[in-house]
From Swiss-Prot:
This protein's UniProt keywords: Meiosis, Nucleus, RNA-mediated gene silencing
Subcellular location, record wording: Nucleus, Nucleolus
Compositional bias of kind Pro residues: 48-70
Protein name: Protein argonaute MEL1
Similarity annotation: Belongs to the argonaute family. Ago subfamily.
Organism lineage: Eukaryota, Viridiplantae, Streptophyta, Embryophyta, Tracheophyta
Gene source species: Oryza sativa subsp. japonica (Rice)
Gene name for this UniProt entry: MEL1
Span of domain PAZ: 407-520
Database matches in SUPFAM superfamilies: PAZ domain, Ribonuclease H-like
Compositional bias segments (type: Gly residues): 1-12, 24-37
Biological role stated in the UniProt entry: Essential for the progression of premeiotic mitosis and meiosis during sporogenesis. Regulates the cell division of premeiotic germ cells, the proper modification of meiotic chromosomes, and the faithful progression of meiosis, probably via small RNA-mediated gene silencing. May be involved in histone H3 'Lys-9' demethylation in the pericentromeric region.
GO molecular function list: RNA binding; RNA endonuclease activity
Tree of life domain: Eukaryota
Amino acid sequence: MAYRGGGRGGRGGEQRPPYSGRGDVPGRGGGGGGGGAPPYRPASGFVWPPPGMTPRPGPPQPQYPRPGPPAVVYGAPMPAAHHQGAYQPGGVYRAPSPGVPVIGGYARSTPVTIRAPPPSHSSAPAPYQPAAAAPAPSSSSTAPSATALAKEFEQKLFVSETALAPPAAVASAAAAPAGEASVESDKDLAPVSKKGLAHPARPGFGAAGKKVMIRANHFLVNVADNNLFHYDVSINPESKSRATNREVLNELIKLHGKTSLGGKLPAYDGRKSLYTAGSLPFESEEFVVKLIDPEKKDKERAEREYKITIRIAGRTDLYHLQQFLLGRQRDMPQETIQVLDVVLRESPSWNYVTVSRSFFSTQFGHRGDIGEGLECWRGYYQSLRPTQMGLSLNIDISATSFFKPVTVIQFVEEFLNIRDTSRPLSDRDRVKIKKALRGVRIETNHQEDQIRRYKITGITPIPMSQLIFPVDDNGTRKTVVQYFWDRYNYRLKYASWPCLQSGSDSRPVYLPMEVCKIVEGQRYSKKLNDKQVTNILRATCQRPQQREQSIHEMVLHNKYTEDRFAQEFGIKVCNDLVSVPARVLPPPMLKYHDSGREKTCAPSVGQWNMINKKMINGGTVDNWTCLSFSRMRPEEVQRFCGDLIQMCNATGMSFNPRPVVDVRSTNPNNIENALRDVHRRTSELLAREGKGGLQLLIVILPEVSGSYGKIKRVCETDLGIVSQCCLPRHASRPNKQYLENVALKINVKVGGRNTVLERAFIRNGIPFVSEVPTIIFGADVTHPPPGEDSASSIAAVVASMDWPEITKYRGLVSAQPHRQEIIEDLFSVGKDPVKVVNGGMIRELLIAFRKKTGRRPERIIFYRDGVSEGQFSHVLLHEMDAIRKACASLEEGYLPPVTFVVVQKRHHTRLFPEVHGRRDMTDKSGNILPGTVVDRQICHPTEFDFYLCSHAGIQGTSRPTHYHVLYDENHFTADALQSLTNNLCYTYARCTRAVSVVPPAYYAHLAAFRARYYVEGESSDGGSTPGSSGQAVAREGPVEVRQLPKIKENVKDVMFYC
C-alpha cells in the first residue's frame, strides 16, 4: 500500500544579488472543496491509487449533498469566487451550521436560498474625493441602504461565521455621505473567519507555452497502511534542550523498549510528542531513568534522575490523507503529515546537527573558512510535502555558518582582526565579542585530567588583572590572575583582557579566554557581513548538473530504505528525482520610444540591451549636482559625471550637462553637514533664479562602507533630495554596461519609464489588466537580524500608479512590532471629537492612483512577499479585511474584486533540465530556460499555485519562485495569472533582464530594506542599532515601536528605492 502523493539571480544594476538589502549601488553586469466523503474506514487497509483509478487529471469537482428544506437569507455575505463556492441569487445552497464540529474536513450544512435585495434606483455614487472627511455615524448598527447591499452582493463579499445572521448584523455601516464612506470600528467590517476564507481551488492547468519535461528535487514516498498513535510526553525536571530530551527518551527505550513499550520503536520530536505505529500496551504510564553527565566531577551531581510520563493523546490513520491527496478533502491532515515527517527526521536528528529543517555535518564535505572565526558547514534540507502526485520528500543541499572549534583567543583575534594581543580590548570590541559569544558553549583546558563545559552569558567589564572575587567563606579575595596561579599553577598571559562569564549575575563563574575552547558544532545565528555572505556563496555555489548530482548522492547516503524508523512505520522513499511536465512561456514584446532605431524588443533568453533603443518616457533633469566622499581626484569625478550624463541623454533622457553648483569633494567624516550644505547652497541659488528645487544628487560613496544608510536617511526624510549613490571602484573606471544600468535607475527616480509591455497599448491586450483600471500592489515585511530583540519590523507596500502600463510604483513604509508578519498599517482608524479619520497605506495608495490616472481601481491584484505556509490563513484573514475596509472607507459600496497572491522565494524546490548541456533546453548557465512554469505533480493537490522560473541564471542553480493564490475574486485562469506574472518580470526598472521575483514584490522588499536605514543608519558590525550594547534584551512585554521618519512627498512621488 503506497502513497504517491540555486544560485543567485541576475545582477542587473545592483551591487548585490536580489534581496540583498542595498538597492541603490549599481553593479557591473547585465543587467469549496469537494463534498464530504462518506465516513468510511477500511477494515484492512487501502491501496493508493485505488485499483483501476488513474491519477487525478485535474482539480476536484465539488459534490454537494442533497439539500433539505431551504432557509431564506437576504444579502448574506457569500464567497467571492465561483471556484470558492460563489452563490447566485435564486439558488439553493448549503451553509455551515453554527456550532457543528467539522467532520472529515467539512462541517454539516444548512440549506440556504440566496435572494438578491431589490435593485436601487438611486444614481451611482460619486467618485471618492481624497479631501473629503465623513462625520462619524451616530450608530454603527444603522441598517444599510439598498444600494449598499446591492453593491455588496454584486461584489460577492466573504463567507463569514455569521452567514445566517440578519443583514443588519453583518453589513458594514453605510451612514456616510456620498463621496466617502467611514469605517468607524471593527464592528463595521469584522474580520471574516479562517473557515470562510478557504483558499481557491485550482481553476485548471495552464496550457500556454512550449511543453517540456524537467526534473525536480522531490522524491516519491510510499506509506504502508498503519494506525498511527500520538502520545504526550512530560519530562520532569523539564529541559528546553531537545538533545537532553532525546537522551532521556533514548535511555527509556533502552531500558523498557522490549518490555513496557511492547517492542515498539517510537519517533520523538524532542519536545512533547511521541508517535508509534500501533498502540503501546498502556494509555498512561510513568517511568524513571537516570542519566550520567560525564562533565560533572562529583558523582552525585553527575547522576541526574528524570521522571517521564507518557499518556495517549490521539490516534490517526491514513484515510484523511488519502482523501486529501485525491482532492476529495480540502483540509490538509497536518497531524498525519507531521507524524511521518518526524519519523523521517528521527535518525538524522541523532547523527547530525539539526538547524530547523536542515541537517549539517562535517561528513558532507570540506569546511570552508568564511572569515572572522566562522566556517561553512554543508548539509541537506528535508521536508515531507503533500503534492498532486502524492507524498514527496523535498531534499536540497544546504550550507550555513558555524563557529570554528578554536580557542576563544583565536576566535577573538580573527573576529576583531587583532594583530597586537598585548593591548587591552576597547569598550567597542568588548561589546562586539559579548554579542557574538553570548549563549556559546565552551570547554576549559587548563586541567589535563578534566574538561568542563560552560555556556557564556557575558563578558566582564574590567580586565581579569583587576577582577577580584571571593574564593572562600572567610572573605578571602583574589584577582583571577592570582587565583589561577595559586590554584592551578597556571600563569595567564592575557591579563589585560576581560574574562568570559558563565552562570548568573548573582553567582558568576569567571573564565579566562585563554583556557577556553569553543565546542564544535555550534551554529552562528547572527547576521553575516557582506564578505562572509560572499564567501559562503562562493563555497557552496554549484551549477545545476553538480547540484542535482549532489542531491542524488545525499539521498543514497541517507539510505532511507535501511532506516529503522522508516521501516517501523512502513515508509519507503524512492531514490530518483521525479520527472515533471513543465511549459516555457514566451517572453513579452517590450515597447521603447519611437525616436529610437528599435521601437520594440523581443528579449532573448531573459535578457536584452539598450543598443539602438530609447526609454519609452525619458525623465528630465535640469537641476543636479555631485558630491564625492571618495579619494577620487576632482577631474575623475567630473569625467564620470560627464560620461553618465552622456549615457542618460543617449538613452532618451533630457539631462542638463551643467550642475547647479560645482561638483565638489568633501571629507567622509562630515557627511551629514556636507549634505545639508549642498542642499542649502543649491536651494538658495535655484530660488533666486526661480528654477524649482534640486532634482538629483549624485553621490560618490567613501571607500570604507558605513555611510550609505546615513546618506539615504538624510536625503529622503530630512532634505527631500532624490539621490543616486555610486561606488568609487565603479565610478573611477565605468564601463558602458555600468553607466547604462545607472541611467536606468536615475530615469525612474526622476519620474520616467524605461520600458513597458507592448500589449499594454492594445485594447484588452493584457488579460484582466487592460479590461478595467487595475492597480497592482506589492507588500513585504522585513525583520531585524537575530539578537536584535527590541528592534521594530518594517512593512512596505508599493502600488502601480499608471494604467494600463503598470510600470511606475509608489512606495510607502511603516514600522510595526518586533517580528510581526501581519502588516498593521494597511488600514487604520483614528478619531477626533468631530469626525472619523481613516488612514493606512492601502487607502493612501488608492487615492494616489486616482490622482495619477483620473480613474478609481476596479480590480486589485495583491502580491504579498515573505509569508510562510503556516501563516497563510492568519495573514489572509487580517490583510484582506484591511484591504476591504480601506476600499469601503473611500466610497459607499466600493469593493473592487481582489486577487491575493503569496510570493515565496525561501523554499527548497529546485528544477533541473531533463538533459544537461542541451542549448535548446538550458540557458548559458546550464539552468532551465526563463519562463519555465510548473503547475502539475509537485504543486498543491487542490489549491491554485505554481512555480515560475522567470529569469536566466548567471551562476549556480536558479531558484524558481513559488506563487500561491490565497484569494481570487477576479477568477483568473491559470494561463492568465502565470503569463501576467511572467511578463511583469520583464518590466523591472533597474536592469535589462527578467528578474526572478515579480517586480511589485521586489520593489516592496527594496523599500522595506531602505526604511531600515532610516532607523539604523548602516552598521559595519552586523546591523545593530546605534547605541546598542550588543546585549540581547529579554522582552518581558511589548516594546514600544520606534516610528520611522516621514519620507518627503517629492521623494515618495518617484521610485526612490530603486
